[in-house]
């Protein structure tokens, strides 16, 4: 009997947390042992009442010892999720500031909102490629949120939203914004009209734009009513804040006319256009601003190196070893350097200004000259002897102390050539040979 009394007291003092009834269920043996108890004895050991309100917030996100994984919610209705969000927000306000329970509630609130966003904007099985206004949009797989939609200027939530990027101009937007795009791909303009605006900020005024954005035609004003007008330093036109994000870019006209490479604010469309045009050799400096060579010494050095490389090119084309070593591929990033010496890209001018191009081109020039003059016997055999003094080493047209006849391409010492500039031995010999072969021809 003493053991049974202890067992009853133990069961009354240790409650079952899973028992939701008003009192603890008693073993039949206990009823027989303790047929009745007065209120004074049972009061201290009575089982407390537990109320379990049916709250929407508890539908998969309430805190308990057997909580479900984060992100798993039983609430599948939009109305239930909204009610759960409100209850979670109220709980956050009631909990102690910076407590662990408040932080957990904030995490639950975030997941509830993501779930609601997913229901409002469900993922659709959309195609991987969309072609629109010469844009080639490919579906992105990145879940990063560090992107902004170029159309609506809002964040792209890659975790729950489908978004696309144009492979031609890097235009990024939500899938729901694709049909709202009105501007064609910038790459099409680069392909058909590869030229720069060479006037510095050619402003025409807001009245010429009818006080509307130059791209989307949204009403704008310099007083920011109804929308702020932002000027693009490249086109000189005004844009709204959705089409002009204050991006910075180097302006070609300022670089050519002022040798100024300070980035200026441009519109989104101009930024993409300038980025695609950056490496295109479309600037003929001798025609646009020939005086620039008188004031920028680096340009003169680069022009001389490029002229020398063009003189070296015939040696490499006819040299088997040079073709096997692919020496000319050292300039594959600047293909125009082996085609002409007067066309420049904006990237070339940037690298000249920073000094990077001068260093790299000097190294390439040294490598090319070493192959022709030292490493390759076939290329050495194509050198020249000065026919005026008949002294000295083998000469090459790219040597700094030589001069080349403009008619027959013979190479002489510079001093010898200018002292005998009235006559070229090789030209005289070729003319004499023509007279012998064609006696009736004029000299």
From Swiss-Prot:
A zinc finger (Phorbol-ester/DAG-type) spans 134-185, 364-424. Residues 31-45 have a biased composition (Polar residues). Residues 17-30 have a biased composition (Basic and acidic residues). GO terms for biological process: lysosome localization; positive regulation of bone resorption; positive regulation of ruffle assembly. Belongs to the DEF8 family. Keywords: Metal-binding, Repeat, Zinc, Zinc-finger. It comes from the Eukaryota. The gene is def8-b. Positively regulates lysosome peripheral distribution and ruffled border formation in osteoclasts. Involved in bone resorption. It holds the Pfam family RH_dom. One of its GO terms (molecular function) is zinc ion binding. InterPro entries: C1-like_sf, DEF8, DEF8_C1, Multihaem_cyt_sf, PE/DAG-bd, RH_dom. Residues 14-49 are annotated as: Disordered. PROSITE patterns: ZF_DAG_PE_1, ZF_DAG_PE_2. This is Differentially expressed in FDCP 8 homolog B.
């Amino acid at each position: 009997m003493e053991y049974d009394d202890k067992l009853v007291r133990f069961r009354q003092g240790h409650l079952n947390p899973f028992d939701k009834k008003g009192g603890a269920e008693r073993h039949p043996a206990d009823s027989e042992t303790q047929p009745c108890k007065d209120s004074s004895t049972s009061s201290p050991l009575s089982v407390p009442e537990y109320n379990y309100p049916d709250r929407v917030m508890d539908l998969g996100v309430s805190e308990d010892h057997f909580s479900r994984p984060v992100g798993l919610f039983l609430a599948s209705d939009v109305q239930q999720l909204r009610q759960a969000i409100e209850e979670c927000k109220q709980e956050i306000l009631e909990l102690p500031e910076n407590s662990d329970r408040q932080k957990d509630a904030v995490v639950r609130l975030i997941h509830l909102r993501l779930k609601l966003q997913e229901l409002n904007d469900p993922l659709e099985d959309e195609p991987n490629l969309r072609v629109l206004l010469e844009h080639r949009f490919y579906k992105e797989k990145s879940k990063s949120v560090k992107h902004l939609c170029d159309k609506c200027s809002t964040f792209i939530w890659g975790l729950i939203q489908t978004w696309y990027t144009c492979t031609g101009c890097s235009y990024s937007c939500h899938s729901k914004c694709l049909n709202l795009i009105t501007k064609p791909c910038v790459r099409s303009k680069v392909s058909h009209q590869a030229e720069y605006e060479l006037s510095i900020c050619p402003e025409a005024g807001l009245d010429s734009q009818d006080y509307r954005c130059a791209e989307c035609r949204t009403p704008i004003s310099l007083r920011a009513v109804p929308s702020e007008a932002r000027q693009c330093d490249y086109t000189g036109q005004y844009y709204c804040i959705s089409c002009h994000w204050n991006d910075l870019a180097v302006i070609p006209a300022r670089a050519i006319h002022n040798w100024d490479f300070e980035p200026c604010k441009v519109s989104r469309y101009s930024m993409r256009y300038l980025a695609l045009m950056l490496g295109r050799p479309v600037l003929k400096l001798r025609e646009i601003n020939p005086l620039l060579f008188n004031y920028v010494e680096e340009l003169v050095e680069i022009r001389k190196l490029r002229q020398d490389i063009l003189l070296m090119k015939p040696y490499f084309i006819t040299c088997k070893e040079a073709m096997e070593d692919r020496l000319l591929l050292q300039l594959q990033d600047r293909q125009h350097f082996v085609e002409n010496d007067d066309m420049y890209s904006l990237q070339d001018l940037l690298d000249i200004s920073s000094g990077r191009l001068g260093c790299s081109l000097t190294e390439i020039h040294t490598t090319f000259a070493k192959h022709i003059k030292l490493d390759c016997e076939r290329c050495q055999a194509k050198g020249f002897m000065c026919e005026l003094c008949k002294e000295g080493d083998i000469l090459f047209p790219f040597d700094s102390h030589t001069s080349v006849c403009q008619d027959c391409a013979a190479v002489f010492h510079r001093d010898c050539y200018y002292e005998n500039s009235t006559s070229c031995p090789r030209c005289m010999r070729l003319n004499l040979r023509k007279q012998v072969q064609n006696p009736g021809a004029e000299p």
